[in-house]
Regions:
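Proteins synthesized as precursors that undergo proteolytic processing into mature forms
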Residues: 1-114
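In a subset of proteins, long, contiguous C-terminal domains/tails are tracked
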Residues: 95-147
Length: 147
């Protein structure tokens, strides 16, 4: 009953909905999703940062190394021995970045198995040409196909 995600009257449980839809200049730009529990909102943000801050296309944004924070006090638990949780990173995250995160007090673990980093799919519409571009997850089975 002391878990932050326990069902109680008037309380909304921590839950994320997979699909996301982005509009730009009042036109549809991209529908996408990244399944994977608590990785969903983290993955959504990482995809958007990769595209809009780093200029990656939808496939590059999905293929880029990801991070996944698990544990800690919010939103899904951990006791006093786990106040910060663990930041899992893929091998593609530079050692310099890992060291900087550790120097800031984060507990970082490099994880080679990509399954914990979610599963991503996207359909992107080029605003200038109207051409649709598909992207799919390289960490899991998936296929982007069109005609």
């Amino acid at each position: 009953p002391s878990h932050p995600n326990v069902y109680e009257p008037g309380k909304r449980p921590f839950h994320t909905i997979i699909p996301a839809f982005i509009m730009q200049n009042e036109l549809p730009l991209m529908s996408f999703g990244l399944m994977g529990g608590s990785m969903q909102p983290q993955g959504h943000v990482q995809i958007l940062i990769n595209m809009f801050d780093y200029g990656m296309n939808p496939q590059e944004a999905g293929d880029a190394a990801r991070m996944n924070h698990i544990g800690g006090r919010r939103p899904t638990g951990g006791g006093d021995d786990d106040l910060l949780g663990v930041l899992h990173v893929e091998p593609g995250v530079s050692q310099e970045t890992v060291k900087q995160l550790e120097d800031m007090g984060h507990r970082v673990e490099v994880v080679a198995d990509g399954i914990m980093f979610g599963g991503y799919q996207a359909i992107y519409r080029d605003q200038e040409t109207g051409v649709y571009i598909g992207a799919t997850e390289m960490r899991k089975d998936g296929l982007a196909i069109g005609y």
